[in-house]
Amino acid sequence: MGAAVAALAAPLLLAAANLAVPPRSELNRPWPFFTAEEPEEPPLRAPIDALNSFAMPPGYAVELVAAEPLVQDPILMEFDGDGRLWVMELPGWAHNLSMENSLEPVNRLVVLDDTDNDGVFDNRTVFADKLVLPRAFKILAGGCALIGEPPTLWKACDTDRDLKADTKEKVADGFARLGVLEHGANGLFWGMDNLLVVSEHEWNVAYKAGQFATVPGLRRGQWGVTQDDAGRIYRNVNTDPLFVDYVSPDYYARNPDLVRTRGLYENLVDQEKTNIWPAHPTFGLNRGYRREVFRADGTASYYGGVSSPLIYRGTRLPADVQGMGFVADGATNIVHLLRLKDDGQGRMAAEDFYAKGEFLASTDVRFRPTALAGGPDGSFYVADMYRGVSQDGPLQTDYLRDYITKRGLARGIGHGRIYRVVHVSANGAAAPMPRDARPQMSRDTTAALVAHLSHPNGWWRDTAQQHLVQRADPKSEPLLVKLAKDLKADWRSRLHALWTLDGMGAMRADLALLAMRDAKAELRAAGLRLAESSLAKGDQKLIKAVLTLAGDGNWQVRLQAAATLGALPDAARTQPMIALLSVHGDDPVLVDAALSGLKGNELPVLTALAAARAAPREAVAMLAGALAKRRDAATGQQLVALAARDDLPAPVRTALLDGLALGFAGGAQTGGNAVAGGRAGGNIPGVSRQRGGGNRFELPADPRSLAVLAAGKDALAEPAKKLLALVTWPGRPAPPALPPRSASEEALFRRGQSIYVEQCSGCHQVQGQGQATVAPPLAGSKRVAANGDVPVRILTNGLEGKIGLMPPLGSAMNDEEVAAVLTYVRQSWGNTGTPLPPAAVKEWRLAFAHRTTPGSEKDIDAPQR
């Protein structure tokens, strides 16, 4: 740490040194706490004073462990294997009074250290600087780190052990693009299966034999990734606090013909039953002008912008919060706690932990929790960017921008705080749960690292696994095998041992088989995944075990078996799939997991299921959808004929018609707790490769039976009409074709496609089908194809519609970018609007520049004179 920084930090550090514990928030303050005070210009609070703004449930407090200038503008953090805290600092975000993001290389990755082990960080080293709007980082063994700096994923290393990177190599291109910060690739979370999970992006990162490589995934989540003890991945998005992946994304990526991906990114929280309880009025939100959605005291009742989920797996807080979910909501100055529930079968749900009141709420509008991270001491930490602004400028409504300006909230950058969450006894003494000793994993022996896999604190287990995989010491293998086989060991330790062996390329079929026969469901499910490399080789013992587990009494084991069946040799796959789906084919999550492994084998499975006495409608519809999406003419004709057979039960025929329509339209379907394609920009594999325009699927012959159904008056008529509108055949008049685009219009269209996928598909979906309660469909939208002023006004001024707020995303785009993305949506998915030239966009923007709030649907639809 430089002398100037040290001098500035001295008062804070001396204050900490004179106390038995680091500076701490007030214990047992009245809770829930609320103040109606709303200063016209909220003051900047010194770090010590900011502690007085917090209210927590009885027994809880936060300790101040770092503050400016030691840390500034923190957005991400992670502890390394030696107990140092790495922090991504983003001073370039909203860096001026106009709240613009700087494209100058002013951001950095720093390392904080507590050199005297008093619980307060006192040293700062800049590992990497001169970064342009970085979105992610991941600490690696050997003094290295992955850094996501759009559009590049870098690996930077410190080769002389001074904690300063002196080498940098490119790992991959295409890691997001410079644009709206909250919709950029992030995460790089090292999961139990050794896959580095990336949120808001279409690929993840795999580590094999010392090398990193991108692997196909599905775009999910928005900001942050976490996992539970079983290795299930959790994410969140915008105003929805927690989603879970029951199935790994690589399964769905293997079949581009899927029309749905249930089991991936399942919503755990009922929006109608969850509430937040801020400690002060929260009108400083994008929709703060809609006072009717606030409580009488001025507080929002629903999340303003969640991020950084954390499943707490530490040991220093009480048992009732271990395994529970924490989420930050910087927009409303809270950290919310969710109670996770497992129904005993692996199906998860989440609800508010407290009926009223927040786990952590601040009366300071500048408390902006951006990241939560478990620590080696058994507690967890909160990074506070300490800014008056929390909404990315391009997404701000005019109301919010005016609110920020009037209150001076854009002033005061360069601050930042890190807090440790603690639990204390009634008299304020330290809780009986001591902090874990500081780790030294970079210097630990291989045997010591293996021993850490049995640590009760999940941080130690995760970090030790990562070090062992990267170290790849052959001496660890017998120790790991011994632990994996130890039936008396904690199941979590055995699970880590198995995945560590797999990450080292040392997984054995006998170990997978042992896990598949275990009494613990989590181990049986893991054993199925770990067996897959041997299944393709025809290992009969493993194949038999997999078929047995397809009938397991536990849902999560059956679900994994459904996905794993896809790893069987083709000849051995069809009959087990038929058997499984005949019994469980109305479970949408299991159906999609099974179909992910059926590419090329859907037709015989569908034929068998449709002929069954009690055909499972869910499986029938999704199989028909996958086959239709493949767009094979002969198969399409065959399936239309199948749906027209009057000897099949009407529900089965309806399922066939619905599935075919979904597939011909390109997917994707929502339902249940799923968010189709993922709330934040999820693409179902292959969907983005569908052609734009109104191209109907061409059948080889006139489907007269379908026309008969469509002309009927029973329940089959409507789905038949819907399907009939999506197909054509020789002799049927073609729909009006779009005029050819000029070279400049084509360039505009292509550029718009890129912008749309990056910034719009999160809500409206890749195929423009929209999402219920989130965003309306753009495919077939009259407003999209209306006179140019309508879509321009919606994109640049925003729209307050029946579903909710469309933010003025286009306000941060130049005229050409607005023209490009609108040209793309106006000429895709059957839309027939004309291209929009940048000059027209400029004209309409100027005409409606006086608007200060998003327009209403009535305003937008009113004719302009």
Question: Which residues fall in each region the model found?
Answer:
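Sequence/structural segment immediately N-terminal to covalent heme-attachment motifs in c-type
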Residues: 745-769, 783-797
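Flexible coil segments in periplasmic/lumen-exposed cytochrome c-class electron-transfer proteins
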Residues: 22-41, 679-680, 734-746, 808-809, ...
